[in-house]
């Protein structure tokens, strides 16, 4: 599911590219139209892309890591660090923030929040909803990695069988 969401949302890149190129060309050629909506749409596209890719990115180990602590550990040792990190840090934090993000979106919707600019985009709750959805996708990504770590550590399966990727090798750096 995470992969499908990420790959589908990847099409937003085309929209973001088109809007950004038009915005730049309009400014360089001196088109006197108010471009506030386009400029806001640029960051909406960027925020949506980032938010909808975060969960999947974690499952494929595309997230930035500081591996100085685990670089000399065995893969099993790295899996234990990942287990502790998921259970005690990543999952509680992300779940808490994701849970409270729902109030953030509901409040924005109830207030009919819109851009501070008079010619900006309306429906600010929509992008806030995408932020919230992205946080819940991160929670799902953490649960996915956590399940694979548990199966690897306690289920007797190899890292290839559970498609577990933890840390970076020297070749990847």
Provide a role label for each language-model segment.
Residues 1-173:
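Alpha-helical transmembrane segments and membrane-interface helix-loop junctions
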């Amino acid at each position: 599911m995470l992969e499908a969401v990420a790959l589908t949302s990847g099409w937003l890149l085309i929209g973001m590219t088109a809007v950004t190129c038009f915005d730049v060309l309009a400014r360089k050629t001196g088109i006197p139209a108010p471009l506030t909506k386009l400029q806001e749409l640029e960051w909406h596209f960027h925020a949506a892309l980032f938010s909808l890719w975060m969960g999947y990115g974690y499952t494929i180990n595309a997230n930035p890591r500081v591996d100085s602590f685990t670089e000399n550990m065995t893969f099993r040792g790295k899996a234990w660090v990942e287990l502790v990190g998921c259970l005690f840090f990543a999952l509680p934090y992300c779940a808490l923030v994701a849970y409270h993000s729902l109030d953030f979106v509901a409040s924005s919707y109830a207030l009919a929040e819109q851009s501070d600019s008079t010619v900006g985009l309306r429906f600010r709750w929509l992008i806030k909803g995408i932020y919230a959805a992205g946080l819940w996708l991160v929670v799902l990504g953490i649960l996915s990695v956590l399940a694979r770590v548990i199966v690897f550590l306690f289920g007797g399966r190899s890292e290839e069988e559970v498609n577990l990727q933890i840390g970076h090798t020297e070749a990847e750096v």
